[in-house]
Amino acid sequence: MRWLHLAVGVVGVVGFLATGQYMDKVHDHLRGMDDARRLLFRSAHLYLLFGSLVNLALGLYLRPAAGWRRWVRPAGSMLVLATPFLAAAGFFVEPWLSGLDRPYSRPAAYGCLAGMLLHLVCRSTDRETSRAELTAAPDRGGIR
């Protein structure tokens, strides 16, 4: 999962830079656009950066899990991995919807929150239990 988080994070940061250029070149840096549409463009742009940076952080610091954590952590990772993709969809779709509906950005933000809460639950405060579980876990190919 670690490399997947890193890859999604890097691609997401590149996507963030590309969407910034898109707003600048295609929409004249959002000049003359109504306030609601400009708000939707900019917030989705920042959600893309947010989701990408969370994935980068997980990719850099995620450690192997053992025991029940081996099953809970991937669920959290899937939710976090979906965040940049949903934010990117929100960037291109939501500004053109009527009103301030957020059918992509809202699930992206809540999914990232839920995923990180699952990662938090997996982070044991009892170090001895964690060490015992990791020693009992089979070698996972050097992923640390």
PLM segments and residue spans:
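Polytopic transmembrane helical bundles with strong interfacial aromatic enrichment
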Residues: M1-H45, L49-R144
